């Protein structure tokens, strides 16, 4: 219900003509960034970039969740804590976009805040289970779920082809692929 209300608020604040397609942007701005096609054990992408590079909203949306505390421990290795500092938004396309291992989250970024494509959400880092690794942005694309459903939040489709398109200035939407992943999961 909360997510529906957030979408309604977003729609009222930022009305978009019915024919206008969402605009997508690459989630790391003003820095050299590289990434592979596949993640090590589930659908996501690690975008390698220098610490402090801007993590930006890839689409207009509403902030869903923010984690400002890095409580991950290698001893317990709890999945819900692996992302360290993180931000997830629900895009105007109804898809969740998740960035984690951040070194910093921007002041004012909080659940319910409306963001625009390209707006800085935080900075690339190595928090959570990335502690001790090269800085990178873990980037996941998924469908919205109940709070705390970290296995979905971290990613359900491989983002690389969308990242390739967005980096080239093209608006390739992951909506159909996310809907298919959700249906395949029986959700």
What residues fall within each predicted segment?
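Sec-dependent N-terminal signal peptides
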Residues: 4-13
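Histidine-centered active-site/metal-ligand motif
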Residues: 39-42, 91, 101, 136-138
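Short peripheral tails and domain-boundary helices/loops at the edges of structured domains
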Residues: 140-169
């Amino acid at each position: 219900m909360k997510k529906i209300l957030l979408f309604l608020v977003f729609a009222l604040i930022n009305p978009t003509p019915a024919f206008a397609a969402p605009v997508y942007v690459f989630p790391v701005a003003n820095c050299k960034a590289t990434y592979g096609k596949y993640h090590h054990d589930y659908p996501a992408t690690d975008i390698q970039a220098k610490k402090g590079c801007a993590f930006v909203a890839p689409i207009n949306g509403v902030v869903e969740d923010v984690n400002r505390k890095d409580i991950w421990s290698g001893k317990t290795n709890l999945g819900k804590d692996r992302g360290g500092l993180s931000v997830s938004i629900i895009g105007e396309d109804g898809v969740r976009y998740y960035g984690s291992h951040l070194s910093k989250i921007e002041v004012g970024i909080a659940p319910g805040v409306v963001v625009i494509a390209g707006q800085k959400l935080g900075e690339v880092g190595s928090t959570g289970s990335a502690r001790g690794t090269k800085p990178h942005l873990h980037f996941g694309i998924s469908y919205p779920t109940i709070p705390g459903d970290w296995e979905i939040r971290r990613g359900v489709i491989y983002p690389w082809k969308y990242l390739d398109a967005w980096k080239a200035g093209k608006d390739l939407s992951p909506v159909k692929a996310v809907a298919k992943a959700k249906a395949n999961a029986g959700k």
